[in-house]
């Protein structure tokens, strides 16, 4: 399966690595946000996903806006685009480039906790569970048909730093289990 992967933050790294480990899946391009100043000296630093893609020897693009590489994406003829913590809202012409659409891995049980900070929202609201949803992206933020979702209990002592890697690992398991089923029509 030919896949374009778009992601930026740490949450996306385990999912990228899991997809890259599948011998019958081919990541044709990893798209991430451009390097940004970080640290005391404000040194330009690649995103966590761009760094992981380089370690995996995957072709990477870091456009200021994803629509700037729309024709390059179309030329790759991806079967599916997977988006995880990318940080940009995708225009419809990018969403519809791949044969089976664009699948988002979102760290909440949609439609609850839409938006850019669902893990923090689950913790500040005192929820006892959250989860991960795989959904087809449409023109609205974190909106579209849910392919699958799975709950995860939030422990009494869980913080963002504890919960994020648990949810990322769950998302990685789900993408392997559910993406192929979705593409094959199961």
Please report, for each region that a protein language model flagged, where it lies by residue.
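N-terminal Rossmann-like dinucleotide-binding module
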Residues: 1-40
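Short, structured coil segments at secondary-structure junctions
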Residues: 23, 56, 97-98
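Donor/substrate-binding cores of folate-linked one-carbon enzymes
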Residues: 80-186
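N-terminal beta-loop-helix "entrance" segment that forms/cooperates
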Residues: 34-54
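Catalytic cores of RNA-modifying enzymes
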Residues: 1, 53-56, 73-80
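Short, well-ordered alpha-helical microsegments
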Residues: 12-14, 69-70, 90-92
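Short amphipathic alpha-helix with an adjacent loop that forms part of the alpha/beta core around
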Residues: 67-77, 96
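Short acidic-hydrophobic, aromatic-tinged amphipathic segments that line or gate anion-handling sites
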Residues: 60-65
């Amino acid at each position: 399966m030919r896949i374009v992967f778009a992601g930026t933050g740490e949450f996306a790294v385990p999912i990228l690595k899991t997809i890259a480990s599948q011998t019958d899946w081919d990541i044709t391009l990893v798209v991430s946000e451009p390097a940004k100043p970080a640290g005391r000296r404000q040194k330009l630093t690649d995103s966590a996903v761009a760094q992981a893609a380089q370690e995996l020897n995957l072709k990477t693009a870091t456009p200021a806006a994803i629509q700037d590489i729309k024709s390059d994406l179309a030329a790759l003829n991806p079967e599916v685009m997977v988006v995880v913590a990318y940080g940009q809202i995708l225009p419809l012409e990018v969403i519809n480039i791949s044969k089976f659409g664009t699948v988002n891995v979102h760290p909440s049980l949609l439609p609850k906790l839409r938006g850019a900070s669902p893990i923090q929202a689950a913790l500040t609201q005192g929820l006892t569970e959250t989860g991960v949803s795989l959904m087809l992206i449409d023109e609205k933020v974190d909106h579209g048909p849910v392919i699958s979702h799975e709950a995860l209990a939030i422990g009494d002592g869980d913080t963002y730093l504890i919960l994020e890697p648990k949810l990322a690992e769950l998302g990685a398991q789900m993408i392997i289990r559910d993406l192929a089923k979705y593409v094959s029509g199961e």
